[in-house]
């Protein structure tokens, strides 16, 4: 969902919803990899029934990762995707269902955002190439050093769109992967696997929600099914709440801000391309022996417990003395609806509502104030009561003027504080050019800050040595420039791997021009004139914008609770109206057009692709994007404006692209449809979901019999054979059958010669037109035990926050007291000294452990290694004066001191007294 910072706001406001995943790792014995046994109980101390994968959130980081080298070719990409799924399966360990959903053709309402994102990606790619070429030339002219430019084909991530050859190949690879795992992995033997590839219309997460909704409506559904959905989009939280399932958990990668990214020219971290000076790479180790050996920190996962979020919301939304009965489930639906106003994938957010300014808290406060007047809830089962919504919007509209003025004041205060900070930094630079660093650096009296945790011994030791070398070199250089004096002003020879600009340079960045000036009188007139090019007195136009936005609110809520109400509807403007414009909206919406159909895959490609990605389309189709004689050439501008809309960065702005006219697009494509090959026609057709299972599953014999009798009629699934799951089965056109070899589409992987899996087409159970899925707790649903404690309601109560590991709040977790943390502060120095010992040519001892890569150590003395799992033992041991080193056995890449406490056991190394 297009709500920047939504998850950050949510996790800060409701911190107990987050649980860190416990992940068992496979082992290696004599060069043989031993995988994790996923048949064993889940180490997170919870058992999940169904795991749903929003596959696009997996495909993108596996094909073009940001924090490690990209795969060399498509085969490596497929293997990376398989490994990612394996890792998630290992953490979650579903016992009934694995559902993999790839984005298919999206509703027209989503295509606006998809089009903007793909045009931006193409534009940024061209600008990046130009910038790299320009900066490279400048650096070389100044005598800088840059590694030779690699000539390699750039991976166009736009190919991750339905209808491309890449997505078709991915579907084939996933079919192979599922067959291989069902045949060879014991943890898969009793689960049903659903694959909804890119040929099936719908966004991945909404195909998953549609599956859950339709299964909930069946009489055999288990109301206490424990769902786990994988995905990083913020809208998954709202979608999970909208199911009203009591046991719903989301798993996602843990977001770590400010992760270093290598420069695209020199490959070093700490600066961007525009600031590259072509400095030679420093040696990693005395003889560069550590170059290319530093392992990248593995991405960690977290759980988001929606049952705990429901606890928070129950406390926040409960209202007394209402003129109608309080219904918590209805209030949750209203909360989800109010979140739409701060942004989503289908509508721009209202100008006065910014998530970073506490917009949701403001809306909830207004909601609770006016609910006595509204006489009821805002929504019911995905349908909106517009008369009540208008009262909320009018209350927001009254405050709009103050909101805009406060926003301006906050911005000015922020700039003022930054300016003062830069002045302080400049004053500090006037001090001595050489200061003692490390353990002998001066510290303020009484400072009790805990030291950083050791993340990777070898890596950090190298960093320490490089930093101390650089400090010494800079100090010497400054003293020489200053004629031997020990103090000097700021030097131009600052470290090129740090901040590349002087502190004052940021003042020279031009402020984006804001012609609207929402904080000044006349803001509404200027807004409509600048954004819509109409006079603010044009009431008919403003009403048209509001009506479209109201339709959008109704469409989005229906999409979340009932499915796609219209494949054709979309919001036809780049900007939203003001809250104060929502007047007399009760009769602005009646219903959507019935029986609309989605685009076909190649048609959607024509609607969302820029001309630069035309190579993924048939030749005559791509000519429509570039030929001057094309009747739709105006859909594909080579360049386009980006309106910052009051923001600072281009990625936050609004891409001013022309909207695609569906009628004109279809008319132009009618002339080139006959040019499609049979393969292109197949890729342009709509497909269906496929169900897979292994030989030991109770449903296996039933499906095998369908193939034996060649039954072409749809057959209902016997619910008793499949955990209550219902739907219709049809024979697959290219089936995976037992005893048939499944060929590997990836050359580096082996064929499945003794396949025991079987696959069949699957269709969700149908419902009559006009059927309404009830947004309620199902009969028999058991509410999970409450998790929150009284202290969890007090924010900033002074207690140290410790993240929970796994679902058991009473899990034994080792932690260190203050003396232990002080000892950890000297780990860097200790390892630094070990690694820098000049080893003789005699026999060297290798110290190996899973926490850190092996490195040579001169045997100075013998060490005794003790492993403790008792908190009491650790506290005692940490106080022992002979402690040399303490660090975590597991999760050594943890990034903050607070994270240390969640890992056990702890490794303590003492010098032996023998």
Q: How does the language model describe each region?
A:
Residues 828-830, 849, 861, 873, ...:
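Low-complexity, intrinsically disordered or signal/transmembrane-proximal segments
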Residues 1-827:
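Noncatalytic, typically N-terminal accessory segments of nucleic acid-processing enzymes
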Residues 54, 844, 854, 874, ...:
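Low-complexity, intrinsically disordered segments with a bias for serine/threonine
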Residues 879, 902, 908-911:
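Compositionally biased, intrinsically disordered low-complexity segments enriched in Pro/Arg/Gln/His
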Residues 827-834, 841-846, 865-869:
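Intrinsically disordered, low-complexity terminal segments enriched in Ser/Thr
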Residues 839, 862, 867-869, 876-877, ...:
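Ala/Thr-enriched low-complexity intrinsically disordered regions
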């Amino acid at each position: 969902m297009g709500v920047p910072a939504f998850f950050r706001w949510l996790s800060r406001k409701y911190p107990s919803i987050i649980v860190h995943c416990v992940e068992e790792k496979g082992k290696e014995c004599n060069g043989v990899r031993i995988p994790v046994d996923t048949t064993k109980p889940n180490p997170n101390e919870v058992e999940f029934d169904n795991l749903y994968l929003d596959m696009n959130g997996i495909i993108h980081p596996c094909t073009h990762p940001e924090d490690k080298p990209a795969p060399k070719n498509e085969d490596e990409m497929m293997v990376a995707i398989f490994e990612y799924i394996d890792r998630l399966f290992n953490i979650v360990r579903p016992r009934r269902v694995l559902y993999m959903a790839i984005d298919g053709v999206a509703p027209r309402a989503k295509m606006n955002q998809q089009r903007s994102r793909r045009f931006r990606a193409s534009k940024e790619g061209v600008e990046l190439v130009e910038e790299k070429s320009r900066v490279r030339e400048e650096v070389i002219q100044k005598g800088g050093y840059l590694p030779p430019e690699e000539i390699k084909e750039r991976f166009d991530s736009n190919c991750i769109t339905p209808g491309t050859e890449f997505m078709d190949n991915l579907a084939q690879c996933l079919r192979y992967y599922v067959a291989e795992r069902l045949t060879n992995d014991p943890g898969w033997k009793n689960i049903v696997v659903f694959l909804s590839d890119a040929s099936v219309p719908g966004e991945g997460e909404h195909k998953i929600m549609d599956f859950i909704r339709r299964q909930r409506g069946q009489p055999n559904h288990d109301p206490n099914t424990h769902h786990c959905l994988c995905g990083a989009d913020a809208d998954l939280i709202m979608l999970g709440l909208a199911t009203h399932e009591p046991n719903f958990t989301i798993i996602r990668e843990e977001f770590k801000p400010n992760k270093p990214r290598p420069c695209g020219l020199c490959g070093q971290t700490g600066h961007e391309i525009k600031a590259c000076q072509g400095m030679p790479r420093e040696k990693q180790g005395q003889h560069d022996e550590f170059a290319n050996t530093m392992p990248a920190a593995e991405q960690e996962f977290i759980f988001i417990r929606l049952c705990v979020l429901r606890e928070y919301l129950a406390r926040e939304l409960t209202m007394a003395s209402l003129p109608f009965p309080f219904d918590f489930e209805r209030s949750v639906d209203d909360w989800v609806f109010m979140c739409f106003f701060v942004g989503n994938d289908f509508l721009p957010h209202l100008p006065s509502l910014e998530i970073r300014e506490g917009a949701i808290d403001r809306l909830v406060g207004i909601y609770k104030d006016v609910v006595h007047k509204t006489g009821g809830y805002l929504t019911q089962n995905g349908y909106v009561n517009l008369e009540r919504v208008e009262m909320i919007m009018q209350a927001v509209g009254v405050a709009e003027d103050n909101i805009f003025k406060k926003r301006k004041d906050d911005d000015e205060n922020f700039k003022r504080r930054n300016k003062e900070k830069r002045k302080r930094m400049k004053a500090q630079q006037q001090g001595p050019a050489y200061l003692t660093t490390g353990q002998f650096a001066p510290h303020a009296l009484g400072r009790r800050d805990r030291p950083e945790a050791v993340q990777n011994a070898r890596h950090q030791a190298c960093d320490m040595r490089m930093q101390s070398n650089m400090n010494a070199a800079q100090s010497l250089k400054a003293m020489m420039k200053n004629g031997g004096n020990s103090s000097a002003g700021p030097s131009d020879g600052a470290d090129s791997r740090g901040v590349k600009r002087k502190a004052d340079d940021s003042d020279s960045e031009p402020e984006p021009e804001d012609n609207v000036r929402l904080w000044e009188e006349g803001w509404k007139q200027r807004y409509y004139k600048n954004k819509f090019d109409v006079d603010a007195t044009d009431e008919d136009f403003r009403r048209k914008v509001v009506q479209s936005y109201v339709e959008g609110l109704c469409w989005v809520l229906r999409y979340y609770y009932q499915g796609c109400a219209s494949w054709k509807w979309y919001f036809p403007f780049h900007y939203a109206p003001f809250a104060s414009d929502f007047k007399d909206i009760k009769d602005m919406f009646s219903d959507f057009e019935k029986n609309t159909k989605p685009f076909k895959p190649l048609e959607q490609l024509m609607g969302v692709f820029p001309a630069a990605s035309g190579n993924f389309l048939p030749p005559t189709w791509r000519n429509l994007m570039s030929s001057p004689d094309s009747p739709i050439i105006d859909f594909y501008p080579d360049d386009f404006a980006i309106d910052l809309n009051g923001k600072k960065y281009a990625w936050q702005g609004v891409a001013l692209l022309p909207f695609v006219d569906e009628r004109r697009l279809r008319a132009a494509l009618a002339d080139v449809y006959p040019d499609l090959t049979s393969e292109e026609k197949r890729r342009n057709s709509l497909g269906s979901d496929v169900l897979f299972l292994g030989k030991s599953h109770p449903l296996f014999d039933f499906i095998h019999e369908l193939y034996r009798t060649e039954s072409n009629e749809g057959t209902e699934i016997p619910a008793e054979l499949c955990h209550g799951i219902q739907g219709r089965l049809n024979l697959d056109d290219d089936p995976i059958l037992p005893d048939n070899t499944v060929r590997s589409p990836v050359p580096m992987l082996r064929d499945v010669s003794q396949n025991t899996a079987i696959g069949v087409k699957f269709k969700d159970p149908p419902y009559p037109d006009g059927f309404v899925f009830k947004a309620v707790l199902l009969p028999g649903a058991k509410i999970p035990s409450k998790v929150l404690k009284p202290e969890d309601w007090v924010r900033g109560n002074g207690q140290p926050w410790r993240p929970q590991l796994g679902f058991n709040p009473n899990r034994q977790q080792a932690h260190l007291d203050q003396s232990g943390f002080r000892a950890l502060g000297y780990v860097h120095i200790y390892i630094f000294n070990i690694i820098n010992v000049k080893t003789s040519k005699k026999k060297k001892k290798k110290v190996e452990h899973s926490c850190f890569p092996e490195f040579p150590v001169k045997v100075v003395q013998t060490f005794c290694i003790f492993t403790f799992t008792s908190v009491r033992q650790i506290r005692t041991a940490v106080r022992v004066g002979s402690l040399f080193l303490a660090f975590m056995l597991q999760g050594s890449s943890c990034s903050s001191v607070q994270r240390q406490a969640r890992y056990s056991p702890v490794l303590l190394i003492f010098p032996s007294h023998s």
